[in-house]
């Protein structure tokens, strides 16, 4: 991981520096919804940019990261620092994507995300950028896939209390996961990504609610996790209600705007229900403690 993380950081610094040196201009982009299907920005954008502002997959890797720390005191520097660093890297790449191609139509025709990264890297950093792009776009996702399969295997084995010491036991759990992975390769990427995005953000929502309960049980300020948990509950609920891969088909021929409004209302109701449930259980816990 250190070498891939370093390549991403070096590439981001190089791209950012290149934008400054070349005095790159970001075109004036109107703050309007450009979705050709007429769908709203919310909640779809919050699912499309999965692993951006919040990520359930990142949450599952926290225990693995924690095992690499020498002391618990390093946790704040590592996790908070990683969060800020990832945000800066995201802003650099957003600026690069907007300025390099000259406008929205050109960016839309540039190709897939991997192609865009390669074009920008080679265009700004030359051959060095191409090598870094190879590490960041090809090698890094491969290691992420490896981590995903390993995490899934360990999660399933732990849930079933199935020991993973013997190599045969590992294969028994891993092979079915590999079969599922191969099957997913035959499904269009944009469909897989939408399901991944929703499941990823749903997992993040669950992690936030777990954090809320954890903080409350220890008498800490749980609002710092409660407000994001409430917001994300609205996001994931309203998305799965209104999205094409969700329950939108049950609304028949209703106008999509009407469906989206209904979905957001349902999301708010679910969020308020979860919040009420938390306060009720938290009050009971306090009474038992007293």
Residue ranges and their predicted role:
Residues 49-69, 93-95, 127-160, 201:
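Membrane-helix boundary/coupling elements in multi-pass transport proteins
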Residues 1-22, 196-207, 223-231:
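Membrane-interface loop-to-helix entry segments
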Residues 208, 214-227, 243-290:
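Terminal cytosolic tails of multi-pass membrane transporters
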């Amino acid at each position: 991981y250190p070498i891939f993380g370093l390549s991403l950081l070096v590439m981001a610094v190089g791209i950012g520096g290149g934008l400054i040196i070349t005095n790159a201009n970001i075109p004036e982009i109107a703050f309007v919804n450009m979705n050709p299907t007429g769908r709203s920005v919310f909640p779809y954008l919050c699912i499309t940019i999965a692993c951006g502002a919040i990520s359930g997959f990142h949450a599952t890797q926290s225990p693995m990261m924690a095992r690499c720390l020498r002391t618990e005191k390093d946790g704040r520097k590592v996790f908070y620092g990683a969060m800020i660093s990832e945000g800066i890297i995201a802003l650099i790449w957003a600026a690069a994507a907007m300025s390099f191609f000259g406008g929205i139509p050109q960016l839309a025709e540039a190709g897939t995300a991997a192609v865009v990264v390669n074009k920008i890297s080679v265009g700004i950093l030359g051959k060095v950028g191409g090598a870094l792009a190879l590490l960041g776009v090809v090698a890094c996702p491969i290691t992420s896939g490896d981590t995903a399969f390993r995490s899934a295997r360990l999660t399933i084995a732990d849930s079933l209390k199935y020991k993973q010491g013997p190599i045969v036991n590992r294969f028994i759990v891993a092979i079915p996961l590999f079969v599922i992975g191969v099957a997913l390769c035959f499904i269009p990427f944009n469909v897989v990504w939408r399901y991944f995005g929703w499941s990823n953000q749903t997992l993040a929502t669950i992690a936030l609610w777990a954090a809320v309960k954890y903080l409350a049980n220890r008498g800490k300020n749980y609002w710092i996790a409660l407000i994001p948990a409430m917001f994300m509950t609205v996001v994931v609920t309203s998305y799965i209600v209104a999205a094409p891969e969700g329950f939108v088909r049950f609304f028949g021929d209703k106008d999509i705007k009407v469906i989206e409004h209904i979905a957001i209302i349902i999301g708010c109701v679910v969020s308020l229900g979860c919040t009420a449930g938390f306060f009720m259980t938290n009050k009971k816990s306090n009474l038992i403690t007293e």
